[in-house]
């Protein structure tokens, strides 16, 4: 049975941890508001670019732009994985890394068996995890979320485009956490390259636009902007989902600490009561012995 001193030491440690988790929850909540606003603001622009690209692709020969042209055979696959730089965010990283493994081992098992699956990892957790397990991580961006800006997303998009154009990848897949709500993150996979209109964009593509100077010239300008914007949107979504996951995890840890403190206080009071009872019994026994 633990002594009173042992329980006091444990109580002190748990109370200290509770203060840390409570502070981290408050910090994550503040960061979540900013991250959520940025993610939501990026969605309309990214969606409109995708809609315009879908409209243009119906008016030009897509084979003239290699980033719009699917390959006859998909022999090489590039997976762009977005995780976080730090932990203490529940299952945020573990779940998305499991999804990435499932995509590689199930959807592209043949390519993986030939060593033809490469990865770009944004975030320290993903790059560390997959490099330790022998995956081909061609480029990592550790610390990217410590100061998240558009230039990082642009660099990733340009690298993916170059690898696709050089034939180092026949398909580029994005794997990330999409922000839905604080309690419901959404694991997502999207095809980045070749660019293909999603379901429902065909109707939007029917909208009539007047193009100057020409659809071909505009699409050449629009494609890189679209890629940069999509990667930027994905990173903003992931950042917001990370802060939501961390806030929820720290809230749960704080509540667990509160419950543990309650249980330990009960144990402490019982142990203290038992010690007092024992001392009283010894005093009474000593007094009786003196009377005899």
UniProtKB/Swiss-Prot annotation:
GO biological process, one term: proton motive force-driven plasma membrane ATP synthesis
Keywords on record: ATP synthesis, Cell inner membrane, Cell membrane, CF(1), Hydrogen ion transport, Ion transport, Membrane, Transport
Keyword Cell inner membrane carried by entry: yes
SUPFAM superfamilies per the UniProt record, alphabetical: ATP synthase (F1-ATPase), gamma subunit
PROSITE patterns: ATPASE_GAMMA (PS00153)
Cysteines paired by S-S bonds: none
GO MF entry, a single one: ATP binding
Top-level lineage group: Bacteria
Pfam (any one): ATP-synt
Gene Ontology, cellular component aspect: plasma membrane; proton-transporting ATP synthase complex
Membrane topology of this protein: Peripheral membrane protein
Compartments (UniProt record): Cell inner membrane
Family per similarity comment: Belongs to the ATPase gamma chain family.
Function: Produces ATP from ADP in the presence of a proton gradient across the membrane. The gamma chain is believed to be important in regulating ATPase activity and the flow of protons through the CF(0) complex.
Assembly: F-type ATPases have 2 components, CF(1) - the catalytic core - and CF(0) - the membrane proton channel. CF(1) has five subunits: alpha(3), beta(3), gamma(1), delta(1), epsilon(1). CF(0) has three main subunits: a, b and c.
Protein name: ATP synthase gamma chain
Protein's organism: Chlorobaculum parvum (strain DSM 263 / NCIMB 8327)
Species lineage: Bacteria, Pseudomonadati, Chlorobiota, Chlorobiia, Chlorobiales
Gene designation: atpG
């Amino acid at each position: 049975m633990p002594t009173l001193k042992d329980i006091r030491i444990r109580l002190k440690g748990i109370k200290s941890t509770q203060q840390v988790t409570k502070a981290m929850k408050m910090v994550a909540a503040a960061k979540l508001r900013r991250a959520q606003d940025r993610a939501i603001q990026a969605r309309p622009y990214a969606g409109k670019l995708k809609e315009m690209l879908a409209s243009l692709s119906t008016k030009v020969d897509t084979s003239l732009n290699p980033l719009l042209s699917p390959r006859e055979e998909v022999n090489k696959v590039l997976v762009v994985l977005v995780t976080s730089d730090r932990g203490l965010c529940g299952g945020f990283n573990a779940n998305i890394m499991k999804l990435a493994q499932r995509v590689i081992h199930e959807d592209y098992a043949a390519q993986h068996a030939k060593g033809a699956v490469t990865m770009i990892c944004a975030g320290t957790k993903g790059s560390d995890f997959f490099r330790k397990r022998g995956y081909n991580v061609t480029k990592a961006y550790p610390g990217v979320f410590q100061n998240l800006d558009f230039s990082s997303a642009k660099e990733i998009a340009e690298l993916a485009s170059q690898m696709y154009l050089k034939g180092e990848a026949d398909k580029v897949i994005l794997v990330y956490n999409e922000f839905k709500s604080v309690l419901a993150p959404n694991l997502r996979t999207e095809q980045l390259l070749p660019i293909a209109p999603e379901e429902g964009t065909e109707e939007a593509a029917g909208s009539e636009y007047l193009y100057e100077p020409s659809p071909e010239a505009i699409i050449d300008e629009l494609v890189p902007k679209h890629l940069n914007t999509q990667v930027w949107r994905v990173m903003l979504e992931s950042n917001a989902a990370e802060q939501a996951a961390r806030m929820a995890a720290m809230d749960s840890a704080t509540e667990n600490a509160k419950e543990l403190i309650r249980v330990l206080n009960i144990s402490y009071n019982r142990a203290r009561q038992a010690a007092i009872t024992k001392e009283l019994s010894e005093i009474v026994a000593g007094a009786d012995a003196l009377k005899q």
